[in-house]
From Swiss-Prot:
<dbReference type="Pfam" id="PF05192">
    <property type="entry name" value="MutS_III"/>
</dbReference>
<dbReference type="GO" id="GO:0003684">
    <property type="term" value="F:damaged DNA binding"/>
</dbReference>
<dbReference type="InterPro" id="IPR045076">
    <property type="entry name" value="MutS"/>
</dbReference>
<dbReference type="InterPro" id="IPR007861">
    <property type="entry name" value="DNA_mismatch_repair_MutS_clamp"/>
</dbReference>
<dbReference type="Pfam" id="PF05188">
    <property type="entry name" value="MutS_II"/>
</dbReference>
<comment type="similarity">
    <text>Belongs to the DNA mismatch repair MutS family.</text>
</comment>
<dbReference type="InterPro" id="IPR027417">
    <property type="entry name" value="P-loop_NTPase"/>
</dbReference>
<dbReference type="InterPro" id="IPR017261">
    <property type="entry name" value="DNA_mismatch_repair_MutS/MSH"/>
</dbReference>
<dbReference type="InterPro" id="IPR036678">
    <property type="entry name" value="MutS_con_dom_sf"/>
</dbReference>
<feature type="binding site">
    <location>
        <begin position="616"/>
        <end position="623"/>
    </location>
    <ligand>
        <name>ATP</name>
    </ligand>
</feature>
<dbReference type="Pfam" id="PF00488">
    <property type="entry name" value="MutS_V"/>
</dbReference>
<dbReference type="InterPro" id="IPR036187">
    <property type="entry name" value="DNA_mismatch_repair_MutS_sf"/>
</dbReference>
<dbReference type="Pfam" id="PF01624">
    <property type="entry name" value="MutS_I"/>
</dbReference>
<dbReference type="InterPro" id="IPR000432">
    <property type="entry name" value="DNA_mismatch_repair_MutS_C"/>
</dbReference>
<dbReference type="InterPro" id="IPR007696">
    <property type="entry name" value="DNA_mismatch_repair_MutS_core"/>
</dbReference>
<protein>
    <recommendedName>
        <fullName>DNA mismatch repair protein MutS</fullName>
    </recommendedName>
</protein>
<keyword id="KW-0234">DNA repair</keyword>
Length: 855
């Protein structure tokens, strides 16, 4: 668009001058410019929109001597087009006509009333109902990062201060913001490159004093001590920029944003980006949502419940008091699931409706849904009243009753309101006397027109005469062409059609003016009454938000009760003793997709048994066994029941996974480099209370390098860090670790080989595996028989060269699989270069001492 911008607008028409001035205020984003029933785009905006939305690009005359590229969309379909643009990461400024065309001498007055961006949308047509839509801001200084997130559709405002790059990367993956604000001098661009909705902001928006002032103004406070964020300067810098951006885009007050909460690492189990990805919590490795933990666990009946459950899954809490309360609630609700869920389903997405109420963008159907949600509360209270559980009763109290608001909306809004207030017919009859009077006048038109038609037919004797109305010409009397010559003299021709003539008479014109006036006044009054409803509802916003949060939590807990009953989960026991003891544990996702019974397995990790070396064939179930342990721990720490017969679990501060890897081509990192980076992160950050899953360390390099790295990593985790570790490997040398270190044990997953076939038992047994079964798995995968045959020959050759290769000790001298020559010692090299015939007796004696020192 810049190519067409003329800073001197005088060459343009008045309408284009107005457009260009508005566009100059929003140069980086699309401007939807309201003209009658359409939003128009001009110049480069039109070209861009035609490509993004697949709409026609036309021209609108000329301005300053140049044809103007133009594209347009009908105003009634704007939400569909906005959704397409937002999904592509675009932002749009909505410019409306605010002046009256009838009284405007020049172009109608217009102004930008809101800016729609990916992170600040609240309209249900633009949002995914079962996912949070977050706006985030990131700040960095020499001490670490500041990070703030806001869900404008709920008012949930959070900040944190990640100490290092890995923690910041994990936060970005956990929150997955739709839009991310960053300072113009942000140094770690590699951390955020490739993320959607990046917005570069000026440095002054991140100033700490401005941030404190903005936040205190928003919350109506003198300081931020009460929120526990007073000293979080880096987080506040990010939060201040974020709040300013929201105010700039929304152009309205934000009463639903009432507090800010600090998220501290010590409050939750920390999972890095690789762990979240590998455990497939809400997204599978292919980027979809099928066969994830959330897909199995989420049978919530409200969108706000679904979003809360996903937040719980990504932020397991370490406070066992909270977890035991959740367990108690789940147990107490199991008998009432079938009664509660149908009622909860009717509550809908109250959380987001309240956000639109706060932004004053709620539509008539939003208020109807709010009324419907209020109508469910008495039934929910009645059902929960009999549940003898203190946490359940606390939830019931937070839900509230809102009988007065329910009564207000039942009186004010009709049962099935139209989409928009401007369509009319939103306010119920009987709510307002004056409105009823204007409506009666407007609605009486049909009876009057029927009477007028009968009277005029009788008076004129014209049987083709009829009275009608259209939006262009208003009311008219129509007579067929064949009888039009008989029209009375007081009939004034208004319109000529092919087969008829249309007339107006003074009486009809007078009535038309009266009816149209009444319709306009009724609509204006209806809009006024609708706005007054907001004023009556908004003082209760804080209580309503608390109720929505309680209803969402109830939905999550009822859902977990249903899942526990349906999927045969058990309630885990928390203990202060380190370790995890699982009896007949199952993988929550794999057991749902199998067509055969899942083989349950035990697990025992304790201070005396901190590391399990897991061996067995490929496809034998090692990765499944490891992941199910992490998922059982994760479920326990959101308060859920777990897929096992019995679980006792101690303190866990972090979960790490080094499971599988792929090339990171975008960053120029090989599979091995990715693997080593993840391994380094674990070795630097794991503690004795961490759960660590290590799968096939050292595969991407030579046998010696890989084995040495795997051995050293296992040694470090077992001896120095003392983390609870599951260490799967194909290096059979590692099965000797239990003989050399305390707290290490061998387990294996077995298989049976019969001829060319192999049967995986998927059962975990104590001790090391007897062999790898690699060739049998290759045959099962369809590798050609001649290749398998040749591989067997080569295997026999290698085994004959180095019969003890699999059993040699790693900390002693290990023979090469390909019998490479040993490294020559310095003493041997010196002897080979020595000429004994040239030595004197004294020199020979000196050489003996020298060789002695070299050995």
């Amino acid at each position: 668009m810049n190519e067409s911008f003329d800073k001197d607008f005088s060459n343009h028409t008045p309408m284009m001058q107005q457009y260009l001035k508005l566009k100059a205020q929003h140069p980086e984003i699309l401007l939807f410019y309201r003209m009658g029933d359409f939003y128009e785009l001009f110049y480069d905006d039109a070209k861009r929109a035609s490509q993004l939305l697949d709409i026609s690009l036309t021209k609108r005359g000329a301005s300053a001597g140049e044809p103007i590229p133009m594209a347009g969309i009908p105003h009634h379909a704007v939400e569909n087009y906005l959704a397409k643009l937002v999904n592509q990461g675009e932002s749009v400024a909505i410019c409306e006509q605010i002046g009256d065309p009838a009284t405007s001498k020049g172009p109608v007055e217009r102004k930008v009333v809101r800016i729609v961006t990916p992170g600040t949308i609240s309209d249900e047509a633009l949002l995914q109902e079962r996912q949070d839509n977050l706006l985030a801001a990131i700040w960095q200084d020499g001490k670490g990062y500041g990070y703030a997130t806001l869900d404008i559709s709920s008012g949930r405002f959070r900040l944190s201060e990640p100490a290092d790059r890995e923690t910041m990367a994990a936060e970005l993956q956990r929150t997955n913001p739709a839009e991310l604000l960053y300072a113009e001098d942000f140094a770690e661009m590699a951390l955020i490159e490739g993320r959607r909705g990046l917005r570069r902001r000026p440095l002054w928006e991140f100033e700490i004093d401005t941030a404190r002032q903005q936040l205190n103004l928003q919350f109506g406070t003198r300081d931020l001590v009460g929120f526990g964020v007073e000293n979080a300067s880096r987080g506040l810098c990010a939060a201040g920029c974020l709040l300013q951006y929201v105010k700039d885009t929304q152009r309205t007050s934000l009463p639903h944003i009432r507090s800010i909460t600090m998220e501290r690492q010590q409050d939750s189990i920390i999972m890095d980006a690789a762990t979240r990805r590998n455990l497939e919590i809400t997204q599978n490795l292919a980027g979809g949502v099928e066969n994830t933990l959330a897909a199995v666990l989420d049978c919530t009946v409200t969108p706000m419940g679904s979003r809360m459950l996903k937040r719980w899954l990504h932020m397991p809490v370490r406070n066992t008091d909270i977890l035991r309360e959740r367990q108690q609630t789940i147990g107490a609700l199991q008998d009432t699931v079938s009664e509660l869920q149908p009622v909860l389903r009717q509550v809908g997405d109250l959380e987001r409706i309240l956000a639109r109420l706060a932004l004053r963008t709620a539509r008539p159907r939003d208020l109807a849904r709010m009324r419907h949600a209020f109508q469910q509360l008495p039934e929910l209270h009645a059902q929960l009243e009999t549940v003898g559980s203190a946490p359940v009763q606390a939830l019931r109290k937070k839900m509230g009753d809102f009988a007065e608001l329910r009564d207000l909306l039942e009186r004010a809004i009709i049962d099935a309101p139209p989409v928009l207030v401007r369509d009319g017919g939103v306010i119920a009859p009987g709510y307002h006397e004056e409105l009823d009077e204007w409506r009666a006048l407007a609605d009486g038109a049909t009876d009057y027109l029927d009477r007028l038609e009968i009277r005029e037919r009788e008076r004129t004797g014209l049987d083709t005469l009829k009275v009608g109305y259209n939006a262009v010409h208003g009311y008219y009397i129509q007579i067929s062409r064949g009888q039009s010559h008989l029209a009375p003299i007081n009939y004034v021709r208004r319109q000529t059609l092919k087969n008829a003539e249309r007339y107006i008479i003074p009486e009809l014109k007078e009535y038309e003016d009266k009816v149209l006036t009444s319709k306009g006044k009724a609509l204006a009054l209806e809009k006024q009454l609708y706005d007054e409803l907001f004023d009556l509802l908004l003082p209760h916003l804080a209580d309503l938000q608390q109720s929505a949060n309680a209803l969402a939590e109830l939905d999550v807990l009822v859902n977990l009760a249903e899942r526990a009953w349906t999927l045969n989960y058990t309630c885990p026991t928390f203990t202060d003793k380190p370790g995890i003891r699982i009896t007949e544990g199952r993988h929550p996702v794999v057991e749902q997709v199998l067509n055969e019974p899942f083989i349950a397995n035990p697990l025992n990790l304790s201070p005396q048994r901190r590391m399990l070396i897991i061996t067995g064939p490929n496809m034998g179930g090692k990765s499944t066994y490891m992941r199910q342990t992490a998922l059982i721990a994760l479920l326990a720490y959101i308060g859920s029941y777990v897929p096992a017969q019995n679980v006792e679990i101690g303190p866990i501060d972090r979960i790490f996974t080094r499971v599988g890897a792929a090339d990171d081509l975008a960053s120029g990192r090989s599979t091995f480099m990715v693997e080593m980076t993840e391994t380094a992160n674990i070795l630097h950050n794991a503690t004795e209370n961490s759960l660590v899953l290590m799968d096939e360390i050292g595969r991407g390099t030579s046998t010696y390098d890989g084995l040495s790295l795997a051995w050293a990593c296992a040694e470090n985790l077992a001896n120095k860090i003392k983390a609870l570790t599951l260490f799967a490997t194909h290096y059979f040398e590692l099965t000797q670790l239990p003989e050399k270190m305390e707290g290490v044990a061998n387990v294996h997953l077995d298989a049976l080989e019969h001829g060319d076939t192999i049967a995986f038992m998927h059962s975990v047994q104590d001790g090391a595996a007897s062999k790898s079964y690699g060739l049998a798995v290759a045959a099962l995968a369809g590798v050609p028989k001649e290749v398998i045959k040749r591989a067997r020959q080569k295997l026999r050759e290698l085994e004959s060269i180095s019969p003890n290769a699999a059993a040699t000790q790693v900390d002693g001298t290990q023979m090469s699989l390909l019998a490479a020559p040993e490294e020559t010692s310095p003493a041997v090299e010196a002897l080979e270069n020595l000429d004994p015939d040239s030595l004197t007796p004294r020199q020979a004696l000196e050489w003996i001492y020298r060789l002695k020192s070299l050995v």
